[in-house]
Amino acid sequence: MTSALTQGLERIPDQLGYLVLSEGAVLASSGDLENDEQAASAISELVSTACGFRLHQGMSVPFKRLSVVFGEHTLLVTVSGQRVFVVKRQNRGREPIDV
């Protein structure tokens, strides 16, 4: 069953799972991230740390989206109000970029 809280998350292409957090507590979860309290805790700490890097005074959250890229998947983190939305997406096969 899809709630208003998660209906957009269900439709994200290549989505492997999601978490919806509020103050570190899991409000909703699915797929690979279903009931993953360890991931929820780590992501909450990551968001808290990232929020400490304020470049401009007055910004409520200093970033729009935080991406953590692993070999085969990426965690996309978005903060909206008091909620943290996390989506685990499958990385599409691309050639590595040489820098």
UniProtKB/Swiss-Prot annotation:
<comment type="similarity">
    <text>Belongs to the LAMTOR4 family.</text>
</comment>
<dbReference type="GO" id="GO:0005765">
    <property type="term" value="C:lysosomal membrane"/>
</dbReference>
<dbReference type="GO" id="GO:0005764">
    <property type="term" value="C:lysosome"/>
</dbReference>
<keyword id="KW-0597">Phosphoprotein</keyword>
<keyword id="KW-0007">Acetylation</keyword>
<dbReference type="GO" id="GO:0071230">
    <property type="term" value="P:cellular response to amino acid stimulus"/>
</dbReference>
<dbReference type="GO" id="GO:1904263">
    <property type="term" value="P:positive regulation of TORC1 signaling"/>
</dbReference>
<comment type="subunit">
    <text>Part of the Ragulator complex composed of LAMTOR1, LAMTOR2, LAMTOR3, LAMTOR4 and LAMTOR5. LAMTOR4 and LAMTOR5 form a heterodimer that interacts, through LAMTOR1, with a LAMTOR2, LAMTOR3 heterodimer. The Ragulator complex interacts with both the mTORC1 complex and heterodimers constituted of the Rag GTPases RagA/RRAGA, RagB/RRAGB, RagC/RRAGC and RagD/RRAGD; regulated by amino acid availability. The Ragulator complex interacts with SLC38A9; the probable amino acid sensor.</text>
</comment>
<feature type="modified residue" description="Phosphoserine">
    <location>
        <position position="67"/>
    </location>
</feature>
<feature type="modified residue" description="N-acetylmethionine">
    <location>
        <position position="1"/>
    </location>
</feature>
<dbReference type="GO" id="GO:0071986">
    <property type="term" value="C:Ragulator complex"/>
</dbReference>
<dbReference type="GO" id="GO:0008361">
    <property type="term" value="P:regulation of cell size"/>
</dbReference>
<dbReference type="GO" id="GO:0061462">
    <property type="term" value="P:protein localization to lysosome"/>
</dbReference>
<protein>
    <recommendedName>
        <fullName>Ragulator complex protein LAMTOR4</fullName>
    </recommendedName>
</protein>
<feature type="modified residue" description="N-acetylthreonine; in Ragulator complex protein LAMTOR4, N-terminally processed">
    <location>
        <position position="2"/>
    </location>
</feature>
<keyword id="KW-0458">Lysosome</keyword>
<dbReference type="GO" id="GO:0032008">
    <property type="term" value="P:positive regulation of TOR signaling"/>
</dbReference>
<comment type="function">
    <text>As part of the Ragulator complex it is involved in amino acid sensing and activation of mTORC1, a signaling complex promoting cell growth in response to growth factors, energy levels, and amino acids. Activated by amino acids through a mechanism involving the lysosomal V-ATPase, the Ragulator plays a dual role for the small GTPases Rag (RagA/RRAGA, RagB/RRAGB, RagC/RRAGC and/or RagD/RRAGD): it (1) acts as a guanine nucleotide exchange factor (GEF), activating the small GTPases Rag and (2) mediates recruitment of Rag GTPases to the lysosome membrane.</text>
</comment>
<dbReference type="InterPro" id="IPR034601">
    <property type="entry name" value="LAMTOR4"/>
</dbReference>
